[in-house]
Regions:
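ALDH superfamily catalytic-core signature
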Residues: 1-122, 149, 184
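Conserved C-terminal structural/oligomerization subdomain of aldehyde/semialdehyde dehydrogenase
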Residues: 59, 105-185
Length: 185
């Protein structure tokens, strides 16, 4: 359950592209996928707008085709977990995009779901679950300190990401983030 932090000094185009690619590349079915993003409340609206736009533009289909970015999830159990996660997001937060099982030809010959982005309360269980799905949980925070605290609140932490142009934030991230591999910008 890898976390990324987006601060008010971030380049939002770069941050939205990086988060989208990390969350939804290989359908989120990789150990290094970004599953949680913590966004400074002062920049949440413009960042999330770009993230949703970029996610909406993703091509879903046969991953062997050149222009396809999102392929199928692995099996029916993954679809069921996706549907439970979407239902929880709708019930407890706000689903910004996604949530559909895609069954129109040619997507009817596989387990295709639309990449989902959900804004949730910071205490929500989905921030702690390792889903291995194209599902991104968004938490809005009021400070960089809170973003670091929330990022480190998981017992999982293979990778951690930061989008910031503030050198002090970058230094603190490298010193305080509890993850094996760290990425900046």
């Amino acid at each position: 359950k890898n976390a990324t932090i987006v601060t008010q000094s971030a380049d939002f185009d770069m941050a939205s592209e990086g988060v989208m690619r990390s969350a939804f590349g290989l359908q989120g079915q990789k150990c290094s996928a970004c599953s949680r993003v913590y966004v400074d409340k002062r920049v949440a609206e413009p960042f999330l707008k770009l993230l949703v736009e970029k996610t909406k533009a993703l091509v879903i289909g046969n991953p062997a085709q050149r222009d396809v970015f999102v392929g199928p999830v692995i099996n029916k159990a993954a679809v069921e977990k996706y549907e439970r996660s979407v239902a929880a997001a709708k019930r407890d937060g706000s689903l910004l995009i996604g949530g559909e099982l895609l069954q129109e030809p040619p997507l009817d010959r596989g387990y295709f779901v639309s990449p989902a982005i959900a804004q949730l309360p910071l205490s929500h269980a989905l921030f702690q679950e390792e889903l291995f799905l194209p599902f991104l949980s968004v938490g809005i925070v009021d400070s960089f300190d809170r973003a670091l605290e929330e990022s480190n609140r998981s017992h999982l932490g293979l990778t951690g990401g930061l989008f910031s142009n503030d050198e002090r934030e970058i230094e603190r991230f490298f010193d305080e983030m509890e993850a094996g591999v760290l990425y900046v910008n």
